[in-house]
């Protein structure tokens, strides 16, 4: 007890006497700092601290800890295993998932100094040791080298049992150059390959590791490796490639420089200047814009006073058929017609209506001369062959030059021969005889002329002088002429239609001079009524002596209000039948009725007994004969 009191007194008196003895100053030790604890494998851990000043006196350090949930303070179990200013906790003193409260105390002759307390958990303070046995090998893959790096985990890390799991990272850099490290994450594998190496370069390689929850370990020792030269054989190839590339680049540069002007014009074409006629650029530059614009503006535009009718242009459209469209085409209807002079047009195309009664084609020139020649030749032949019939032929020729058109036949087409016709004259109500001639068309029957016969022209001329005439009332055109008479037929086809059916009945009246009779001869095998005129009593025997005498004859009485032909029955003495063999010298004509069947001049007529109506007064009404079925 007395010793302890003496020690205390000594310590109290010592500071008072020490400064006076050697002139030094003493103080309490400094506070320990930077306390850290690390566990390399989660089984043991070590704590380090940094000591403070000792105060001029010998100072000792002690580590005290207290476990979580306990008030018992424990001192460090081992100050020597981990080195100076450290404390090592072995497996017996290490617990995981338990927090440790650690405090370091510095003590000297003047007193004690306590550090700040530090709480640690062994699980989160794990920092393993660096990997061991680092090896680097140069490998080749298809002639290209690469580095294969391998290592082993720290010896104290129990990675096999899974107590601790480590991940690795390595870094590589060239030795000759002061370049930065190139880091590569390797994961949990203990081998890694490095590609894209420089030929002949030396590389430095290091590896480190860390647990799932913890800190990276220190870098392992550096491993050096040199990559062999693997591009020495290709140096010449690369040199050649560079030379050729430079040559091509130089050539392209020279071509671009030589063609720079053309290229400039191609990519950047020049902007054309103003090309306005009368544009003065000097006036524009001087700022006199009014004068420039006044030179460009046209005076009196738009025109204030102008006869716009002068600007209109009238066009005259003339319809000219190709190669006489009136020529008959076999098996076809002919609708071509020319617009006659002085006739009104019924359409904007300039083509006259084919339904007008005045649209007859006016022949001139050679056709007229041909008509005159044919008429003269016909007269001569008629005089030589048919001399006894002169009186009757002269009276029959006006009828041969006329066309009988029914008022009901509005769509009838009559075939004519120009050799016996003159131009059609306009209708005049004062001249009924001329109006009748204007509206009639003569139609000769060519049934007796075989196609292509050389004497057809001669027969036609003789028939024109005959005392018989034939009228066609059908809707179909007669059979066309053969190729022997193409020119005659081309100039002779005329299409004539009645004017508005019944609008002009007076123009169709028969001549007022009722001196000519019509004899009903017979009905032939084609159902045609054969008639022949009887101008006088003595000429009738001369006209056709072979004709048999009948008990009844028909006299043209007139035309009734319905435009029907009225024939008067009359008894005449019979003539002898001795001249019956002379039938070849007479040419008969017939009034044909409308049927679908075609003949040489007109279709086969309907039965005559169905077309005639005998009136009570003794007249034969043939109005139905001339009415055409539409």
Curated annotation (Swiss-Prot):
Biased composition (Basic and acidic residues): 380-389
GO cellular component: a single term: external side of plasma membrane
Pfam families the UniProt entry points to: EpoR_lig-bind
Motif placement: Box 1 motif: 267-275
Alphabetical keyword list: Disulfide bond, Glycoprotein, Membrane, Metal-binding, Receptor, Repeat, Signal, Transmembrane, Transmembrane helix, Zinc
UniProt domain Fibronectin type-III: residue ranges: 31-128, 130-230
Single annotated GO MF: metal ion binding
Spans traversing the lipid bilayer: 235-258
Descriptive protein name: Prolactin receptor
Originating species: Oreochromis niloticus (Nile tilapia)
Species lineage: Eukaryota, Metazoa, Chordata, Craniata, Vertebrata
Gene: prlr
């Amino acid at each position: 007890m007395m010793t302890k009191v003496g020690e205390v007194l000594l310590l109290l008196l010592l500071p008072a006497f020490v400064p006076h003895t050697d002139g030094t100053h003493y103080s309490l030790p400094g506070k320990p700092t930077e306390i850290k604890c690390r566990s390399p494998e989660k089984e043991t851990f070590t704590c380090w601290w940094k000591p403070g000043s000792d105060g001029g006196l010998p100072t000792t350090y002690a580590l005290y800890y207290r476990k979580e949930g306990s008030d018992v303070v424990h001192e460090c179990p081992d100050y020597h295993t981990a080195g100076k200013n450290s404390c090592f906790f072995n497996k017996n003193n290490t617990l995981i998932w338990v927090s440790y409260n650690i405090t370091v105390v510095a003590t000297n002759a003047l007193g004690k100094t306590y550090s700040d307390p530090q709480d640690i958990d062994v699980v989160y303070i794990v920092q393993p040791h660096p990997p061991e046995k680092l090896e680097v090998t140069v490998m080749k893959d298809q002639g290209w080298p690469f580095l294969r790096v391998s290592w082993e985990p720290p010896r104290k890390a129990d990675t096999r049992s899974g107590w601790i799991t480590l991940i690795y990272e390595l870094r590589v850099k060239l030795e000759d150059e002061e370049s930065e490290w190139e880091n590569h994450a390797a994961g949990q594998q203990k081998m890694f390959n490095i590609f894209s190496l420089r030929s002949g370069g030396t590389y430095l390689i290091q590896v480190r590791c860390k647990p799932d929850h913890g800190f990276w370990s220190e870098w392992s020792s550096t491993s050096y490796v040199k990559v062999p030269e693997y591009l020495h054989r290709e140096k010449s190839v690369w040199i050649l490639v560079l030379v050729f590339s430079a040559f091509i680049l130089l050539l392209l540069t020279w071509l671009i420089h030589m063609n720079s002007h053309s290229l400039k014009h191609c990519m950047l074409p020049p902007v054309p200047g103003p090309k306005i006629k009368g544009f003065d650029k000097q006036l524009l530059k001087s700022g006199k814009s009014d004068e420039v614009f006044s030179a460009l503006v046209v005076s009196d535009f738009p025109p204030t006073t102008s006869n716009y009718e002068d600007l209109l242009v009238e066009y005259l459209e003339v319809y000219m058929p190709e190669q006489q469209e009136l020529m008959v085409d076999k098996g076809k209807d002919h609708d071509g017609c020319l617009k006659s002079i002085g006739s009104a047009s019924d359409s904007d195309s300039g083509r006259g209506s084919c339904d007008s009664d005045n649209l007859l084609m006016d022949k001139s020139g050679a056709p007229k001369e041909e008509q005159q020649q044919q008429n003269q030749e016909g007269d001569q032949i008629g005089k030589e062959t048919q001399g006894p019939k002169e009186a009757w032929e002269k009276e029959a020729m006006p009828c041969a030059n006329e066309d009988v058109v029914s008022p009901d036949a509005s769509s009838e087409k009559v075939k004519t021969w120009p050799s016996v016709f003159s131009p059609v004259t306009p209708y005049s109500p004062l001249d009924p005889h001329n109006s009748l001639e204007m509206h009639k068309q003569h139609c000769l029957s060519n049934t007796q002329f075989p196609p292509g016969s050389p004497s057809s022209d001669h027969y036609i001329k003789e028939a024109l002088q005959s005392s018989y005439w034939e009228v066609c009332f059908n809707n179909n055109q007669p059979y066309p002429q053969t190729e022997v008479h193409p020119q005659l037929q081309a100039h002779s086809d005329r299409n004539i239609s009645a004017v508005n059916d019944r609008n002009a009945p007076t123009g169709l009246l028969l001549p007022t001079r009722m001196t000519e009779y019509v004899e009903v001869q017979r009905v032939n095998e084609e159902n045609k009524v054969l008639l022949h005129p009887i101008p006088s009593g003595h000429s009738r025997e001369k006209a056709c002596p072979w004709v048999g005498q009948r008990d009844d004859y028909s006299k043209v009485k007139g035309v009734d209000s319905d435009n029907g032909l009225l024939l008067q029955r009359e008894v005449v003495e019979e003539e002898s039948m001795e001249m019956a063999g002379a039938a070849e010298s007479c040419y008969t004509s017939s009034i044909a009725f409308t049927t679908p069947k075609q003949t040489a001049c007109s279709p086969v007529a309907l039965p005559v007994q169905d077309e005639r109506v005998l009136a009570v007064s003794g007249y034969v009404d043939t109005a139905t004969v001339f009415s055409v079925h539409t």
